[in-house]
Amino acid sequence: MISCGRVHAPPEFIEQVSKYPNLGDMRQVRPSIRAFEMAIRNIESGTERPRGVLEPQPQKFWDEMMNDTACIIPKRSPPDSLSVDVTRESIKSTLHELCDHFMRNIKTTSIDPRADGAFGLAINMLTLAMEVSVSPSNNFASGRIILRTIVENYITLKYLAKKDDDTIWMQYRNYGSGQTALAFLKNTFAEETPDSIDMERLEILANEDAWLETKDIAVGNWAKLDLRKMAIDAEVKDVYDAYYDWTSGFVHGHWGAVRDSSFTVCMNPLHRLHRVPAPGNPMPAVLTDCCKLCNRSLDEIGQLFPSFKPRIDWKSDGAKA
């Protein structure tokens, strides 16, 4: 409106507006701009519009720009090209050593919830890290889902190790066994069973510790705590805060994660930075974070079942690059 001569203002004010926020004292310039905008708001909204001045049509303008100009799709960034060969071999050898350490620590052929639980969680974490290292998931949304699983495994192991109580170890095992029985019973009476479920295998697992008919099936968290409180009790709230919230979005389909993995922004300024589909957006690699948490789980194994020294070498690949 100033440039069209419809509103007059002192030259110094015009210069401050045109060079905002790089000129003048902002404690004075900002209030002046706000007051000026409020003074002309009625003209723009129509309550005091001069005769012959057309009503603004912002939506029609943006609609025309969308219909008459093409989207500009940004070039997709390539995924990290950093080799993970050394890390992969280190995970493989460490996993092998971990399994050997388990065999050396078998004390009974009866149920041992402490050894099975601790080693099982750690072995599961390293197995998931291995899957990341041999697949494209390292740079995609599925890798974040795996990382989230590793985070929960680690917090659970740390909580169990800190308490180190036979009753709590058994509580963890019984809850998981009951959930297996529940899954079997639900699918037994279902009209259609998912192709990914092997009912014969599921039945064996459901009856492994005891007949499923004799098992208690609990609901909720096995420790009667949510994961955040479990992390606080285990003194690993730093892990929860750093990893859990964002990675959980990919598991639950939260908008932020969906937006990050499925869309990009149109670079045409006349399109107001709207979203356009871009499935398979490459993302920062997750393998290093997976390995860090795996090594922290191995620290717990070393304390529960001394001594265990092997660790995953995740730094050598980065050093080569």
Where are these regions (language model features)?
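Secondary-shell segments that build the walls of catalytic and ion/ligand-binding clefts
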Residues: 1-107, 173-321
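Amphipathic alpha-helical scaffolding segments
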Residues: 145-153, 169, 264-269
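Predominantly late transmembrane helices and immediately cytosolic-facing juxtamembrane segments
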Residues: 161-165
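Long, hydrophobic/aromatic-enriched structural stretches that serve as scaffold segments
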Residues: 92-157
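Active-site catalytic microenvironments for nucleophilic, acid-base chemistry
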Residues: 157-160, 300
